[in-house]
Amino acid sequence: MGQLTKQFGKIKISLPIPHLLNLQIDSYEKFLQEGVPEAERRPDEGLEGVFHTVFPIEDFNKTASLEFVSYEIGEPKYDQAECISKGLTYEAPMRIKVRLVVYDADEASGNRTIRDIKEQDIYFGTLPLMTEKGTFIINGTERVIVNQLQRSPGIIFEHDGGKTHTSRKVLYSCRVIPMRGSWLDFDFDHKDILYVRIDRRRKMPATILFKAMGMSKEQILDYFYTQETYRLEERNTIFWEVRKELYRKDNAYADIVDSEGNVIVKAGKPITKRSWRLICEAGIEAIEMRPDTLDGMFLAGDVADPKTGELLAEAADEITPGLLDRMRDAGINRVSVLHTKGNDTSSSIRDTLMLDRIPDQLKAQEEIYRRLRPSSPPTAEIAASFFDNLFRNPDYYDLSPVGRYKLNQRLSLDEPSDLRTLTDNDILTAIKVLVHLKDSHGPADDIDHLGNRRVRLVGELVENQYRIGLVRMERAIKERMSLQEISTLMPHDLINPKPVAAVLKEFFGTSQLSQFMDQTNSLSEVTHKRRLSALGPGGLTRERAGFEVRDVHTSHYGRICPIETPEGPNIGLIVSLTTFAKVNDYGFIETPYHVVREGRVTDEVLHLDASREGDQVVAQANALLDEQGNLVDEFVTVRVKGEVEMRHRDEVTLMDISPSQMVSISAALIPFLEHDDANRALMGSNMQRQAVPLLRSEKPLVGTGMEVDVARDSGACIVAPADGKIEYVDADRIVVAYEGDVYKKQGGVRAYDLLKYHKSNQNSCFGQKPSCHPGQIVKKGQILADGPGIDDGELALGKNLVVAFMPWCGYNYEDSILISERTVKEDVFTSIHIEEFEVVARDTKLGPEEITRDIPNVSEDMLRNLDESGIIRIGAAVKPDDILVGKITPKGETQLTPEEKLLRAIFGEKARDVKNTSLKVPPGVEGTIIDVKVFNRRSGEKDDRTLAIEGHDTAVLDQKEADHMRALTDRTRALLIPHVVGKQVAASLPGKKKGEVLVEAGAALTEEMLASLPVKKLSGLFKSKEVNDAVAEILKPYDQQVDYLHAIYDSKREKVTEGDDLPPGVIKMVKVHIAIKRKLSVGDKMAGRHGNKGVVSCILPEEDMPFFADGRPVDIVLNPLGVPSRMNIGQIMETHLGWGAKELGRQLAELLDSGAAMQVLRDEVKSIFSSDDINALVDEMDDEEFKASVSKLRNGIVTKTPVFDGATEEEIWSWMERAGLANDGKTTLYDGRTGEAFKNRVTTGVMYMLKLHHLVDEKIHARSTGPYSLVTQQPLGGKAQFGGQRLGEMEVWALEAYGAAYLLQEFLTVKSDDVTGRVKMYEKIVKGDNFLEAGLPESFNVLVKELMSLGLNVTLHQEEGKKKPKRTGYMREREDEA
């Protein structure tokens, strides 16, 4: 049955929002490739890829090789719930199949022949598994691996903006970043010399690298420059040989004449592009130039005397008049020079070459080796192999497919994607592009553009760690292979998986990217999994990240949310993925667009990353369209390269999918986001994640439509994976029989255990409640049970309250909140929090600790709630200092008195010398015991409490199994009905009792008979062979499914009774869960969804609250001054829309209660909702369904106003008029204390308010006497340490200003760090002598010791009787003046 919801959105969104957790789940699935058959696993991806990069492992002599064949992941030993309860990691065992090949080597030929092959399956440790919610359970706590946003491998061109050198010259540079391997940097200095750095080491001229690659001087010049040829003729005349591509804008030295004598360019006139074309067309071969044209040009090759062979000049030498004369004398009449006169070609490469004195390839390679390995002297072979490994060897250098893709894209290359090393052509092309950039002063690449930043997802992060572990293991394997006789070894002798396990454990346990999941509510869970962090290993650090990295970039549109980011030092470094964004195979974030052709929006959807969006003209999602999808306006607002422009509709190429595609889910939950200031929207989206799930959830009257998606995808609800039927429902369990192939092993039947009083990571209480009934037919994607903070399948983090914006006696000062006592009385904002306390009994040197009820010197009253085993009973109400678990610890032997010795001698029993170390309730905790777990050693004895818990757990499992089996049997019976009902039975079937017959021979079977028969007895029961075959066909899988279920439940029962693996030295461990009910109290922090936060300052009786003319009081009073300066007007729009919704809902309920005709009610509903979908839904419903739906609207009509596509001002006014409210949103309120009307009309309405997890009960704290710091002897600070309040410098000034000297002395001595004074004070209070005697504060002694540590000896001298200081001349003068 659909819900009656008022939709204000106008844009139809054709693409569903992708599953919000796909990012995590798909990535890890791709890494594991678990369900993929061995033959189909992709060898370059995930785990398979990691094994293939490390294996085969050969020994140093190449006589043996260890090859990887395949891997297999087993079933986890414990399920998720058991791992959380026992503090274990949710992981699965892994086995790998490896092959050891031993070779015989022929020393003469060097060939190898296979001598022996051994293949073996080896246990290879465990691998943490991801839960279906996208989290990992590590040591019993749920953790999330946050995705990392980092610089993409590839090439990037940058310049310094003229900031580096004093000349303010812009210096260009380029950097090639691989996934693994050496970084390569090229940069120009202020003299235009090109330098190279490898791995950020000392720079050297870049031509050394070219020579090391095997290029000669001439080849370098030939690659970077085009050559021009000049003819040297008589009488110092010089002719330039014309080549069409070498146009130069010069003045003609002499008339340029064609073959017919026509002058094309006169002497002294410039050669234009038009005249250049005419010169080329006329076939003119050479143009006469000025005699000094060649001065300062550079030779393209060596010049030698043709007669003698003597070298006159080398390539790249500068041409001088003297050199020209020598060339003429030697009879050289043609000379080739480098073309550097053009405005886009400088002589920088030639200048670099002249600076570089390295003659050949060998010397160049040795020079590079020397720079990178300064300590070891190179030989030619070592240097050559080292250079080869730098960029050409895939074992040492990996660009990754992403790097190759970026390189091909930026340098316009066409290399295959599996070429993951650098080629010489890559390097030379990069330099060519860099030189061109410098010469043409082109723009640098933008490193903050999302085309240059990629996301490393969970799978990739874990894959990298796995590779590190395998490389460590590889070293150990190689050493083992060389140390022992290889022919006698088996593969398992070589492989030790411990290094891999250690690396994984470290990553999941302590990495900066493996975080304790934020589990305050369902939204905080989802947003944590969709978070992108620029921090972490290989990323930025908070301190070094500048403003540019943190800022919003135009390429973020539709990919990264510009709103949701933390306030404080991490702002802009931790961001969130937008609603529709996906991450592609290369790790770049993509956003979807509709393709637009000739002004018509098509249904075709394109997912584009930021670099492919480059020149596209993108229209906004709210551009007006006609019925056929054509753009209505001739000129449309579009985005081009991040800039907003107006373009003709025919130029538009793409269109946004939805207005909400530019914000994250958290921001998309804020109605009227478009009317809020960005800073407040940021606070609003962050504070929704801090909302505590309340005792009774209530969905917002004003929502955005995203609530359903968040609730469904969060994992907090139970969602049907396929169509099916509800077989059984109670508060703890739902059993569903599904159609199709889901849960095939269990016969399509799945039993869900609902969470009850589950403690979340943030100590909030998670529980699920069923939202279905037995016999109900459910569809795929339907919600079967609501989770915490979810109401009717929608996210519901707060409550709808009637709000008034008005000052009230100063109780709203500085954003304070005045709230009605009704919210406390009716538990509107009551939440449950669960605290866990743990006690451990250990084996000590003096004997074992014991958990017992028998505690010395403790009254029976203190023990009243403990059972025989000394553990508190479930349901007991506890308060601070109550005993939860009784425990005694043996004390050291003490000297016995003669009397005690006598008693021991008489009674023989050694009187127990133990101290009470029981677990007590800490201060500030008051609640009810809801759960106790006892963990015993496997071999240890079990106490009564453990046996009782085991008995209860086993009974619950038995009941579950019975329900599951019943559902499976009913499902099988339903399948049998069409085959067996009405068919004749071959033989009579006896019952369990003596003489009882269930079915007579020859009788036709009815449905009633079938219901009473055991299903297994139907095998071979019928006369007809076809019927028996059909029955056998159905019963065969049934038997397998029954066996499978029995095996599962038997294993669970075994686990209940088998005992636990406890840490060494631990005998027993007890965990106690206390549920604490926290009602709203003064000091609690509350907030709306628009960043309007405040602290409750007063809880006022209902009768004193301002009230409406009809006597209804408002629930909450907010300060009107909090709105204008903060510019979050969205809250006012929400208030007005919510008021209309509540009022209309109330009117409909009155109509229903007054017994109005059904048709009248239907027409009223249709006119309010005015939507074709709702009209159809209303017509479909029968009267009972319709009544139930209208009754749900009693507290208000749920409205949806999507972000950037919500209700307009006009729509809100007409909605309020429809409800009979004033269209300015104000009304007259009356003072609850006097009954008089307030002077001005007040803005009132309904606002959705949240209670945040900053609760006063968890922060308030008081200290009497407590722990002191060891060195300074001052009280510790903070609630966790039971510390005191610090009296700082400014507080001392305040007391000095009041002249409160004795008070100050008391604060700074006996109440703080005067050790002897503290003891004396105590004694005096005991004696009733309240006189302060302060001593020396310990901090003075600390100061003295610190001075001593500086070598200054400070000693204190007590003066006998104070002597008057000697009067100096200066003092005499001062006294005389006085």
Curated annotation (Swiss-Prot):
<dbReference type="Pfam" id="PF00562">
    <property type="entry name" value="RNA_pol_Rpb2_6"/>
</dbReference>
<protein>
    <recommendedName>
        <fullName>DNA-directed RNA polymerase subunit beta</fullName>
        <ecNumber>2.7.7.6</ecNumber>
    </recommendedName>
</protein>
<dbReference type="Pfam" id="PF04563">
    <property type="entry name" value="RNA_pol_Rpb2_1"/>
</dbReference>
<dbReference type="GO" id="GO:0003899">
    <property type="term" value="F:DNA-directed RNA polymerase activity"/>
</dbReference>
<dbReference type="GO" id="GO:0003677">
    <property type="term" value="F:DNA binding"/>
</dbReference>
<keyword id="KW-0804">Transcription</keyword>
<dbReference type="InterPro" id="IPR042107">
    <property type="entry name" value="DNA-dir_RNA_pol_bsu_ext_1_sf"/>
</dbReference>
<dbReference type="InterPro" id="IPR037033">
    <property type="entry name" value="DNA-dir_RNAP_su2_hyb_sf"/>
</dbReference>
<dbReference type="InterPro" id="IPR015712">
    <property type="entry name" value="DNA-dir_RNA_pol_su2"/>
</dbReference>
<dbReference type="InterPro" id="IPR007645">
    <property type="entry name" value="RNA_pol_Rpb2_3"/>
</dbReference>
<keyword id="KW-0548">Nucleotidyltransferase</keyword>
<dbReference type="InterPro" id="IPR007121">
    <property type="entry name" value="RNA_pol_bsu_CS"/>
</dbReference>
<feature type="region of interest" description="Disordered">
    <location>
        <begin position="1359"/>
        <end position="1378"/>
    </location>
</feature>
<dbReference type="InterPro" id="IPR037034">
    <property type="entry name" value="RNA_pol_Rpb2_2_sf"/>
</dbReference>
<keyword id="KW-0240">DNA-directed RNA polymerase</keyword>
<dbReference type="InterPro" id="IPR007641">
    <property type="entry name" value="RNA_pol_Rpb2_7"/>
</dbReference>
<comment type="function">
    <text>DNA-dependent RNA polymerase catalyzes the transcription of DNA into RNA using the four ribonucleoside triphosphates as substrates.</text>
</comment>
<comment type="similarity">
    <text>Belongs to the RNA polymerase beta chain family.</text>
</comment>
<comment type="subunit">
    <text>The RNAP catalytic core consists of 2 alpha, 1 beta, 1 beta' and 1 omega subunit. When a sigma factor is associated with the core the holoenzyme is formed, which can initiate transcription.</text>
</comment>
<dbReference type="Pfam" id="PF10385">
    <property type="entry name" value="RNA_pol_Rpb2_45"/>
</dbReference>
<dbReference type="InterPro" id="IPR010243">
    <property type="entry name" value="RNA_pol_bsu_bac"/>
</dbReference>
<dbReference type="Pfam" id="PF04561">
    <property type="entry name" value="RNA_pol_Rpb2_2"/>
</dbReference>
<keyword id="KW-0808">Transferase</keyword>
<dbReference type="GO" id="GO:0032549">
    <property type="term" value="F:ribonucleoside binding"/>
</dbReference>
<dbReference type="Pfam" id="PF04560">
    <property type="entry name" value="RNA_pol_Rpb2_7"/>
</dbReference>
<dbReference type="GO" id="GO:0000428">
    <property type="term" value="C:DNA-directed RNA polymerase complex"/>
</dbReference>
<dbReference type="InterPro" id="IPR014724">
    <property type="entry name" value="RNA_pol_RPB2_OB-fold"/>
</dbReference>
<dbReference type="GO" id="GO:0006351">
    <property type="term" value="P:DNA-templated transcription"/>
</dbReference>
<dbReference type="InterPro" id="IPR019462">
    <property type="entry name" value="DNA-dir_RNA_pol_bsu_external_1"/>
</dbReference>
<dbReference type="Pfam" id="PF04565">
    <property type="entry name" value="RNA_pol_Rpb2_3"/>
</dbReference>
<dbReference type="InterPro" id="IPR007642">
    <property type="entry name" value="RNA_pol_Rpb2_2"/>
</dbReference>
<dbReference type="InterPro" id="IPR007120">
    <property type="entry name" value="DNA-dir_RNAP_su2_dom"/>
</dbReference>
<dbReference type="InterPro" id="IPR007644">
    <property type="entry name" value="RNA_pol_bsu_protrusion"/>
</dbReference>
